[in-house]
Design a protein with these regions (language model features):
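Juxtamembrane helix-boundary/capping and inter-helix hinge elements in multi-pass membrane proteins
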Residues: 28, 70-82, 104-109, 127-139, ...
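Hydrophobic alpha-helical transmembrane segments in multi-pass integral membrane proteins
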Residues: 47, 98-102, 151-166, 223-236, ...
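Core mid-bundle transmembrane helix pairs that form the ion/substrate translocation pathway
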Residues: 9-18, 150, 157, 161-253
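Membrane-interface junctions of multi-pass transporters
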Residues: 25-26, 40-83, 204-298
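Short helical (or helix-break) motifs at transmembrane helix termini and adjacent helical loops
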Residues: 116-141, 148-155, 307-313, 334-344, ...
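Structural signal for the N-terminal portions of transmembrane helices
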Residues: 5-10, 59-60, 142-149, 165-181, ...
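Entry/N-cap segments of selected transmembrane alpha helices
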Residues: 5-20, 73-111, 167-185, 283-317, ...
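C-terminal ends of transmembrane helices
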Residues: 14-26, 65-79, 122-135, 140, ...
Length: 388
C-alpha cells in the first residue's frame, strides 16, 4: 500500500456516500456535485495524486462507457427509420460546420475547434438512470450520440496518433487498425446473430434465466475486460472497446432483464462516482484566479451548447421541438473526450496551459449547465405530460 493512502480512501468513501444527500439538498444532479466536491477536497489536500486513485477512476470511466453501451438497443438502432439516421448525420455535419465558423469568428486555437463538435454518450447512461430511457428525447440522443461517439473517437484516435507521430505512414497504420477493428466487430456481430438464430439455447446456456452462480455478471465483466485488452493490444481508444462490449451484451442477451440493473448498481454506486470525483480533482481551483481562464471557459461552453441547440433544429421534424432541445443539451457533455483532447494537446504543446485549463473548466461547466437545464426542461415540459 502506498504511504498516506488512508486519507484519500476515507475521503472518497465519504464523498461517494454523501453526494446523493448533498445533491438533494442543493437540488443539483449528482455528477456535477461529485465533480465540485472532488475539486474542493483536492484544493484542501484531502485528495491528491495517487496511482490507485487514477487507475480506479480510469476503470470508472470505461465502466461508464460500458453501461452506456448496454443502454443501446442495437436492433432498434439498425432498424431505425432512415429519416432519423439521415437527420442525425445532418445534425453532426451542421455541428462540425458551426464549430469551424465559431472558431474562426472567435480566433480560437485549432485544438479547441477540433474539440467543439465532439460527442460522448457516457453521461447519457446517467440520464437514462435518472429519467425513463424509453422517453423519445433519450432515444433520439442515443441514436445521434452513438454515431457521434464513433466519429468522435475516430477523430480522437487520429488526433492522438498525429500529435505523436505526425502525418506519416504510422498514422495510416493507426487508422487502418481502427477501421479493421470496426469492420471485424460488424462481421462478428453478423456471425453471432446467425449462430444464435440457429442455436437459441446457446444464449441461455451462457446466461441462464435461473442463475445461482452469477454467470451473467461473470460473462459481462469478461467481455468488458476482453475488449479493453483488445484495444490495448491495438493501441486504440479504450472507451470504444468498453462501449462495444456493452452493446454486445445488450444485443445478444436482452433476455436477462435484471443484468442491466445489477451492472448499473455497481457502476453508479461505486466506480462512476470515483471517476467524477477524479475529474473534479484534476482541476486546480487556483487557476480560477488566472486571467482569462473563467472567461475563456465560459466562451467555449456557450459556443459548444449554442451550436448544438442550433444544429438540433434539423431534429425537430422527428419528434417535438422540446425533444430536440433536450437532445441538444444531452449531447452537450463530451466531458471525457474534451479532457482527453486537452490532455493530448497539452502534452504535445499544441495548446498553452491557459487553454488547457479553459478546456477542462469548460467540460465541467457544460455538465453543470446541461444537466441543470435538462432537469428544468424535463420538469416543466415532459413530467406533466407523463403524469397525465
Amino acid at each position: 500500500m502506498i504511504p498516506n493512502s488512508t486519507t484519500i480512501i476515507l475521503t472518497l468513501s465519504l464523498l461517494i456516500w454523501l453526494s446523493p444527500f448533498i445533491s438533494k439538498l442543493i437540488r443539483m444532479p449528482i455528477p456535477p456535485v461529485e465533480i465540485i466536491l472532488g475539486s474542493l477536497f483536492a484544493y484542501f489536500g484531502f485528495i491528491y495524486d495517487n496511482p490507485y486513485f487514477d487507475l480506479v477512476a480510469q476503470t470508472g470511466f470505461l465502466y461508464l462507457m460500458f453501461l452506456a453501451g448496454m443502454e443501446v438497443d442495437l436492433k432498434q438502432l439498425i432498424n431505425s427509420p432512415r429519416v432519423i439516421i439521415h437527420k442525425s448525420l445532418l445534425f453532426l455535419f451542421i455541428l462540425s460546420i458551426l464549430a469551424m465558423i465559431s472558431g474562426w469568428m472567435f480566433e480560437l486555437n485549432n485544438i479547441i475547434i477540433i474539440s467543439m463538435p465532439l460527442i460522448s454518450v457516457g453521461l447519457l447512461a446517467t440520464l437514462s438512470k435518472t429519467y425513463d430511457k424509453n422517453e423519445s428525447w433519450i432515444t433520439l440522443a442515443f441514436t445521434a450520440g452513438i454515431l457521434g461517439e464513433v466519429l468522435s473517437i475516430t477523430a480522437l484516435t487520429i488526433f492522438d496518433a498525429a500529435s505523436k507521430t505526425g502525418f506519416n505512414i504510422h498514422l495510416l497504420i493507426e487508422v487502418g487498425y481502427l477501421a479493421g477493428f470496426i469492420v471485424s466487430v460488424f462481421i462478428l456481430y453478423k456471425l453471432l446473430k446467425i449462430l444464435f438464430w440457429w442455436f437459441p439455447e446457446l444464449k441461455h446456456s451462457l446466461m441462464p434465466r435461473i442463475d445461482t452462480a452469477n454467470q451473467d455478471i461473470r460473462l459481462a465483466m469478461a467481455l468488458f475486460f476482453i475488449f479493453i485488452a483488445i484495444m490495448l493490444s491495438l493501441k486504440l481508444e479504450l472507451a470504444l472497446g468498453s462501449f462495444i462490449a456493452g452493446m454486445a451484451i445488450s444485443a445478444f442477451f436482452h433476455h436477462q432483464k435484471a443484468l442491466e440493473e445489477k451492472m448499473s448498481s455497481l457502476g453508479f454506486g461505486f466506480l462512476v462516482p470515483i471517476f467524477f470525483i477524479h475529474v473534479g480533482s484534476s482541476f486546480d481551483i487556483k487557476s480560477l484566479l488566472a486571467e482569462g481562464v473563467v472567461s475563456g471557459a465560459l466562451t467555449i461552453t456557450v459556443i459548444m451548447i449554442t451550436i448544438r441547440i442550433i444544429a438540433s433544429f434539423v431534429l425537430r421534424g422527428i419528434y417535438k421541438s422540446k425533444d430536440a432541445l433536450l437532445t441538444a443539451f444531452a449531447l452537450s457533455m463530451p466531458l471525457t473526450l474534451l479532457i482527453a483532447v486537452a490532455t493530448i494537446g497539452d502534452e504535445a504543446e499544441l495548446i498553452t496551459h491557459l487553454e488547457y485549463y479553459q478546456l477542462v473548466l469548460a467540460s465541467i461547466f457544460e455538465v453543470l449547465i446541461s444537466m441543470s437545464a435538462i432537469k428544468i426542461l424535463h420538469r416543466r415540459y415532459i413530467a406533466p405530460s407523463i403524469s397525465q
